[in-house]
UniProtKB/Swiss-Prot annotation:
Domain of life: Bacteria
Keyword Cytoplasm: yes
Organism: Rubrobacter xylanophilus (strain DSM 9941 / JCM 11954 / NBRC 16129 / PRD-1)
Principal localisation: cytoplasm
Name the UniProt record assigns to this protein: Acetylglutamate kinase
Length: 253
């Protein structure tokens, strides 16, 4: 049975690629959705007067920030996304990476309560699939001091590799990695790293390329697609030229 991991940015499902999910699920694929929610977290922190800062694209997470992150990720964003998928007819079940725990992490030095995934436990997801549900996973992991904030792209890549997924789909707000306003059709992990280190890929694209490269090195092809385009997800899974595909060198022959 085909396994697909889909990473989405936040809670909106209307009018975009996630509207393809009912067909994917009814076609027999085992789908796991991993979500972010950085914008929602920033808005909530601002409203509470909690300062925030970033280092190399990762949010520095102190105890107060983690408390709010759990509230936003495992609470509002996770449940809104699950409800949106339920409205489409997808039997979604919202969980956190700390449940099970699905994601075990080690602390990232200098970033407080930010974790790097070191182990994935798939039993909870297997149980949900066995019951006919689609897991929706919030980007939190369990570490030596309890819960940790985890970059959602990295979490999705680690989950895809652990599950032996057929593909990792990273949804964003552009049509892939763009060069001269056109998506680069295919990259190797080494090429991803060069785009990131050279600064050509910056902002939110850099962590997606790093995550895609990590998945590809683990044997899972990854594709960066526009989550705002209806049909993009189905087209990617059908083998169409959609977005930017990242695979190991030698896999493009």
């Amino acid at each position: 049975m085909r396994t697909v991991v889909v990473k989405v940015g936040g809670a909106s499902v209307a009018g975009g690629a996630l509207e393809d999910l009912p067909g994917v699920v009814s076609g027999g694929a085992r789908v796991a959705v991993v979500h972010g929610g950085g914008r929602q977290l920033t808005r909530m922190l601002d409203s509470l007067g909690v300062p925030t800062s970033f280092r190399e694209g990762l949010r520095v997470t102190d105890e107060r920030t983690l408390e709010v992150a759990e509230m936003v990720f495992a609470g509002s964003v996770n449940k809104q996304l699950a409800r949106g998928l339920l409205a489409l007819g997808v039997p979604a079940a919202g969980v956190s990476g700390t449940d099970g725990p699905v994601l075990r992490v080690e602390p990232v030095p200098g970033l407080g309560r930010v974790g790097r995934v070191v182990a994935v436990e798939t039993r909870l997801l297997e149980t949900l699939w066995g019951g006919g549900f689609v897991p929706v996973v919030a980007p939190l992991g369990l570490g030596p001091r309890g819960a940790y904030n985890v970059n959602a792209d990295d979490a999705a890549a680690a989950l895809a590799v652990a599950l032996g997924a057929g593909e990792l789909l990273l949804l964003t707000d552009v049509d892939g990695l763009l060069r001269d306003d056109e998506p680069v059709p295919a990259l190797t992990p080494a090429e991803c790293e060069r785009y990131v280190s050279s600064g050509v890929a910056s902002g939110g694209m850099a962590p997606k390329l790093r995550a895609a490269a990590e998945a590809a090195r683990g044997g899972v092809p990854a594709r960066i697609i526009n989550g705002g385009r209806r049909g993009a997800l189905a087209g990617a899974l059908a083998g169409g030229q959609v977005g930017t595909l990242v695979r190991q060198e030698g896999a493009f022959a």
